[in-house]
Amino acid sequence: MTTIATGHTAEELPRPEVGAAYDTDVHFYVADGIDSVLPYMPLHWRRTFEMRGTTIGGDTHVPPRFDFPTGSRLRLDAFTPSGGLPGTDAAFAKDDLLERYDIAGAVLSSLEAGQQGQGFSGTEASTVMCSAFNDYAIEHWYEVDNRFRIAACVPSVAPDAAAEEIRRVAPHPGVAAVYLPLTNVPLGSRHYDPIYEAAQEQGLPIFLHITAAEFNYQGTPAYPTGWLENFSERRVAYTLLGPVALASLIFSGTLARFPRLNFVFAEFGYAWAVPLMWRMDSTWRYARPGTPWLTMPPSHYVRERIKFGTQPVDDPEVPGHMDQLVEMLGAETLMFSTDYPHWDGDTPGRVFTTAPQGSKDLIFRNNAASIFRF
């Protein structure tokens, strides 16, 4: 993990030894809150949100106990030249991210849209919000620089409407994935089948990412042992969501039912995947009659169909342990990500520096190119 608090020149920041890299986890924000996305909504909904006084953005849904240690989730050196919030100006992000680090393509998602996809404003409103965010992102990011590709957000709470949204936006060349916010419905539930069917039909991977609303209100995933007390607990707890979600996808038969569909786990961590695969494989062998739809060990499905975003890269005390972890997990499962413009982001030249060149090629470039539309 590289925590960045002050600005640097491009010359001061090392670049990867693999040429141009792909960044699989970048976030955009809307500069003027809901006013930014209202023009992309039907008139009825514009008036509805205006009458309600609906607001989006910020961390108003997060209790003060979870305040960020820097006072903001955003990098202090990534504010725009006009003083705007980081992640609100595509032209500035082009220079600050794409050019600065030699990024060949970046996958964008909106945590603000993700919260709406979880039903933050209600089921019908969530559908309208997600669609508006997607159109906003295409116009204000992809059309500024086509290296910015969109993980189109869909309402997890309304799977049929989500499937319609996928089919609506998928033909656009700026759309690279389907961003599916987590809810308290397990990912392996047939509730999501319309979404998975549409994504597979359109050749788009399912992009999974936290929204920061988890653990905070009914409808989002809950922490298994009760309420969390502080930011540190909360940040670590996100790594617990990934294993449960992955096990659900595997043992429910979802990957077997949708054989051409890939899933991306962004910012859930990945070190846990190694012992989880061991546990899933042994469970499959001992309890195989209960999951007859699995014709191969779970680890096979993981390595063939699952990708993990690398941010945040945790720093083991013994540097060689990271290389061992990558070897056990398989470099073919990892995709580099910066988490720009967040405070704890990683940069290309400072992570996986001792990995073999073949692994770097996979992590920084080839894996992303194989499943995203760049």
Predicted region positions:
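Short aromatic-enriched loop/helix-cap "lid" or pocket-rim segments at secondary-structure transitions
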Residues: D32-S36, F120-S121, Q218-P221, P275-R279, ...
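Hydrophobic faces of well-ordered beta-strands that scaffold small-molecule active sites
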Residues: A21-T24, A106-L108, I150-A152, A176-L180, ...
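Glycine-enriched alpha-helix->loop->beta-strand junction motifs that scaffold or abut catalytic
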Residues: H172-A177, Q200-P205, F258-L261, V302-K307, ...
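Mid-to-C-terminal alpha-helical segments outside catalytic/metal-binding sites
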Residues: T2-A21, A31-G105, D135-E143, E164-R168, ...
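Active-site gating/metal-coordination segments in enzymes
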Residues: R100-A245
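Catalytic metal-binding/acid-base residues of hydrolase active sites
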Residues: H27, N184, T211-A212, I250, ...
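Aromatic-lined glycan-binding groove of carbohydrate-active enzymes
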Residues: I206, I210-E214, I250-R305
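Aromatic-anchored helix/helix-loop segment that forms the rim or "lid"
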Residues: V236-A245, P289-G320
